[in-house]
């Protein structure tokens, strides 16, 4: 079937024309529309069809394709159903090549080899896997070639010559050239420097055809791009037209749009019998066009993986962002002046944060001696300021004037806005609309500090969606923008970078505890776990001190036996999400779950890869605390120690108290109080009527009997 792709481009070249490639998301606008739209494409004169495999978190795509994915998933489309649509289209006479385009996690969840075999049987010709890194592509391509199909690599304006050389070896039918940095979507004009990009790519791809996409929507665009490329890809425009078309008219809309692009030109297509004969022969005699490299190793100063977890599972355009960031980070941490600059800010932060015993909490829990590491006393009220200031220093070293950040509870947003105000950089914070509602105080704090807050209305309107939007913005505005990721999540180098800057928490804890306990180590350290910034910061300095138990407490929401929780390590499975392989809350089709937590800062369906590694090796243990249990932790610390903790930290307080009960009175554990709780007072007031009775806590005002 890869041979059919090669023949398609060869025929177009022989006929002195460009191959037209059109895109549609499977199951959009409805499931029953998909096959008619594909037939409309073919009848209009399309050479190749890209069929999008719906995914819950398509970070490389703009609003149009995002919407089509969301609608398709709401329509119940799964990966097996997508393959069934391909099979149905073939049986109804669609014989032009069909390429399945999508993201890696649903394929990984399905099983790569089984998925490729099933796709070949259904009648697919190949795949574009948007976020598949080259080192993984080498393995996957072998499965694909064994089944006679093709893996089409994506290259971007930012793709290095080294990567171009590798990707040209991967290509056995054609290469998809992303014409501009950013996400998919209609543009008013084609990229002005396209000639130069195509020329650079051809140095490595030689005679392999190049198809160019991103922003093409008119016949004029088609002709302009076609003057330098072999094929032209159109996606968002036709998705919009079909979505807007009335029911029963979508075949006609697809056909007429393609005819307009091609000015009515047609080409010969295979009959149904010819196609099935071609498919049968292809499956029997799969062959590889050219040799492929066995391995691909880019140089990295710091390992990009933690065991099986980590990596850089991102769209090709994002590699430029990560490469620049990694180089800047490597140089900074090797430069003593960077650390001098950072440590000179300790007095501004309020470091070292205090460590002290919680006498009354210890007495209440009746077990180990409980200590509190008071990150809530930092400037801005949480541990987030450590990472935010360090990354803003890094942004200045890289010459960036604009800083963006994502935030859930708002603590990271406030910390980043604070750092930007101190150093004179502009700050834009992406925040889910639901989090904007429940964390109004922090939103106003950010605005007071001069930051612009963008409420993200996609998806669940929480941290996950804010993170996706921040990545999309970054790749479009790399030249001037630095992205301060707030947790130990995302592609390399972010997990290493955030852990490095937050490890001051664990280092101080170790030193302070030893100074007060004759050089001893604590027996356990406890932290809440969302993405992992405070937990990796607390745990990493103790990683090799195996006598110290590491306990992470996740957000159990309504309970891990329900759908309403954020306990990724407790209830998730390995997958790929936001550019990294880690534990992910996902359904049976590999779609990322909606999450729930009373705490906005823990409301995230992934987790840092280092935490995933520690779980897999047994070095750290993880439990989940429900919303009610977290509220109990909130109450205990408030009323026994006079410290109102953040709801995030309240999970750790509850988990630590339960752990302390199993320990001896001469043992010691430390809780990382990652943030203060003034931001959560309104949230607690909202949930108390529901959760208060579960823990025996009623704060309602009694009526004055004398009134």
Swiss-Prot record:
The modification N6-(pyridoxal phosphate)lysine is found at residue 384. Gene3D superfamilies: 3.40.50.1100, Aldolase class I. It comes from Saccharomyces cerevisiae (strain ATCC 204508 / S288c). Residues 1-297 are annotated as: Tryptophan synthase alpha chain. GO terms for molecular function: tryptophan synthase activity. PANTHER family: TRYPTOPHAN SYNTHASE, TRYPTOPHAN SYNTHASE-RELATED. In the N-terminal section; belongs to the TrpA family. Transmembrane segments: none annotated. The active site is at 50 (proton acceptor), 61 (proton acceptor). Its EC number is 4.2.1.20. GO terms for biological process: L-tryptophan biosynthetic process. Its cofactor is pyridoxal 5'-phosphate. Residues 298-707 are annotated as: Tryptophan synthase beta chain. It holds the Pfam family PALP. The modification Phosphoserine is found at residues 540, 683. Keywords: Amino-acid biosynthesis, Aromatic amino acid biosynthesis, Lyase, Phosphoprotein, Pyridoxal phosphate, Tryptophan biosynthesis. It comes from the Eukaryota. Present with 15500 molecules/cell in log phase SD medium. The keyword Lyase applies. This is Tryptophan synthase. It is an enzyme of class 4 (lyase). One of its GO terms (cellular component) is nucleus. InterPro entries: Aldolase_TIM, RibuloseP-bd_barrel, Trp_synth_b_CS, Trp_synth_beta, Trp_synth_beta/beta-like, Trp_synthase_alpha_AS, Trp_synthase_suA, TrpB-like_PALP. The keyword Glycosyltransferase does not apply.
């Amino acid at each position: 079937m890869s041979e059919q792709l090669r023949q398609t481009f060869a025929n177009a070249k022989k006929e002195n024309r460009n191959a037209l490639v059109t895109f549609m998301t499977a199951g959009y606008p409805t499931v029953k529309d998909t096959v008619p739209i594909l037939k409309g494409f073919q009848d209009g004169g399309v050479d190749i069809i890209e069929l999008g495999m719906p995914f819950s978190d398509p970070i490389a795509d703009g609003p149009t394709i995002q919407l089509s994915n969301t609608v398709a998933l709401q329509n119940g489309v799964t990966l097996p159903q997508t393959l069934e649509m391909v099979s149905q289209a073939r049986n109804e006479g669609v014989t032009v090549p069909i390429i399945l385009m999508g993201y890696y996690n649903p394929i990984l969840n399905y099983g790569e080899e089984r998925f490729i075999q099933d796709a070949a049987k259904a009648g697919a010709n190949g795949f574009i896997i948007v976020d598949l890194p080259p080192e993984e592509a080498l393995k996957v391509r072998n499965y694909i070639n064994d089944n006679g199909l093709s893996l089409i690599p994506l290259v971007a304006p930012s793709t290095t010559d080294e990567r171009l050389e590798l990707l040209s070896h991967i290509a056995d039918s054609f290469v998809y050239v992303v014409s501009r940095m950013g996400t998919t979507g209609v543009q008013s004009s084609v990229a002005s420097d396209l000639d130069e990009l195509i020329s650079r790519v051809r140095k490595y791809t030689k005679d392999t055809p190049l198809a160019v996409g991103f922003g093409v929507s008119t016949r004029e665009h088609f002709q302009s791009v076609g003057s330098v490329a072999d094929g032209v890809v159109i996606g968002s425009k036709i998705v919009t037209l079909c979505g807007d078309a009335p029911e029963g008219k979508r075949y006609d809309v697809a056909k007429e749009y393609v005819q307009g692009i091609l000015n009515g030109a047609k080409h010969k297509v295979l009959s149904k019998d010819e196609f099935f004969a071609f498919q049968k022969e292809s499956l029997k005699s799969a062959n590889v066009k050219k040799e492929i490299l066995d391995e691909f190793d880019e140089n990295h100063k710091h390992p990009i993986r933690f065991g099986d977890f980590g990596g850089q599972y991102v769209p090709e355009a994002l590699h430029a962002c990560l490469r620049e960031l990694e180089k800047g980070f490597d140089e900074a941490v090797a430069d003593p002046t960077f650390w001098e600059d950072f440590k000179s800010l300790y007095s501004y932060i309020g470091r070292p944060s205090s460590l002290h015993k919680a006498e009354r909490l210890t007495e209440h829990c009746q077990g180990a001696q409980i200590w509190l590491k008071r990150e809530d006393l930092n400037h801005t009220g949480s541990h987030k300021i450590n990472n935010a200031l360090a990354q803003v220093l890094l942004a200045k070293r890289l010459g960036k004037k604009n800083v963006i950040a994502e935030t859930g509870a708002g603590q990271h947003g406030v910390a980043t806005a604070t750092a930007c105000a101190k150093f004179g950089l502009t700050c834009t914070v992406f925040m889910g609309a639901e989090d904007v509602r429940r964390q109004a105080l922090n939103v106003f704090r950010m605005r007071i500090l001069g930051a612009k807050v963008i409420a993200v209305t996609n998806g669940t309107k929480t941290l996950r969606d804010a993170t996706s939007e921040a990545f999309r913005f970054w790749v479009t505005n790399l030249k001037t923008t630095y992205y301060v990721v707030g947790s130990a999540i995302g592609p390399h180098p972010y997990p290493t970078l955030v852990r490095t800057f937050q490890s001051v928490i664990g280092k101080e804890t170790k030193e302070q505890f030893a100074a007060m306990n004759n050089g001893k180590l604590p027996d356990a350290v406890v932290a809440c776990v969302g993405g992992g910034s405070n937990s990796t910061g607390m745990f990493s300095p103790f990683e090799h001190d195996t006598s110290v138990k590491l306990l992470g407490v996740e957000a159990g929401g309504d309970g891990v036996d329900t759908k309403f929780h954020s306990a990724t390590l407790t209830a998730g499975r390995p997958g790929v999400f936001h550019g990294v392989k880690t534990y992910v809350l996902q359904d049976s089709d590999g779609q990322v779950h909606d999450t729930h937590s009373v705490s906005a800062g823990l409301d995230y369906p992934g987790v840092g890869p280092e935490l995933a590694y520690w779980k897999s090796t047994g070095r750290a243990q993880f439990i989940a605390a429900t919303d009610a249990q977290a509220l109990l932790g909130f109450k205990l610390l408030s009323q026994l120690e006079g410290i109102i903790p953040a709801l995030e930290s309240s999970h750790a307080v509850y988990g630590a108290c339960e752990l302390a009960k199993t320990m001896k009175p001469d043992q010691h554990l430390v809780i990382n109080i990652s943030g203060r709780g003034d931001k959560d007072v309104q949230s607690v007031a909202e949930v108390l009527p529901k959760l208060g009775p579960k823990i025996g806590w009623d704060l309602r005002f009694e009526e004055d009997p004398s009134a």
